[in-house]
A protein has these predicted regions:
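Ferredoxin-type iron-sulfur electron-transfer modules and their immediate structural context
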Residues: 1-122, 127-129, 135-167
């Protein structure tokens, strides 16, 4: 295992994931997103268990509230944290669903796979570096980041907005 201890597998770390694999009679439902299919194949080979094939995933930011699309109407002057901004002021735009732009997702990513775009104010995922560990998903208080299958030829279909209001 890669020893990333990211928790992307659903266990508190690589050691706990390894223990769960050793104690199982099947690797179904178990996957190390950092190591990918090749690591799971090796784990299966060592344990004498077939590793189920899991489609690779990547983090997707479901917000198009760029500086142009969702202009700032407030000035948030507090700790630079999406979690805090969401709980206290609701952010600087009128959109109560979109990205707050403080970069909690960037801080959570230990693989340097997500960065804030200074022009749009939104996070952008580097698909080549993203391991789909889910740390950015957990860090986002607005739940605008999802793990999606990479898709054929790295193509995905998704709506770049999580607003559920009518109209």
């Amino acid at each position: 295992l890669p020893q990333a201890n990211c928790g992307g597998c659903g266990f508190p770390g690589c050691s706990a994931f390894a223990d769960a694999c050793v104690k199982s009679t099947s690797l179904d439902g178990k996957f190390c997103p950092v190591g990918g299919q090749s690591v799971m194949d090796k784990v299966g080979q060592i344990l004498g268990i077939d590793a189920s094939v899991t489609e690779p995933k990547v983090a997707v930011v479901r917000c198009n509230g760029t500086c142009d699309n969702s202009p700032r109407v407030n000035l948030y002057d507090g700790a630079i944290s999406c979690k805090i901004a969401n709980a206290t002021s609701g952010g600087e735009t009128l959109c109560s669903y979109g990205c707050l732009g403080c970069g909690d997702c960037v801080e959570a990513c230990q693989f340097d796979a997500i960065h804030m775009n200074p022009d749009t104010g939104l996070p952008e995922v580097d698909e080549d570096k993203c391991t789909a560990c889910g740390a950015c998903v957990k860090a986002c208080p607005r739940v605008i980041i999802e793990l999606r299958p990479k898709g054929k030829n790295n193509r995905r279909i998704f709506v770049s907005c999580v607003n559920k209001d009518k109209g």
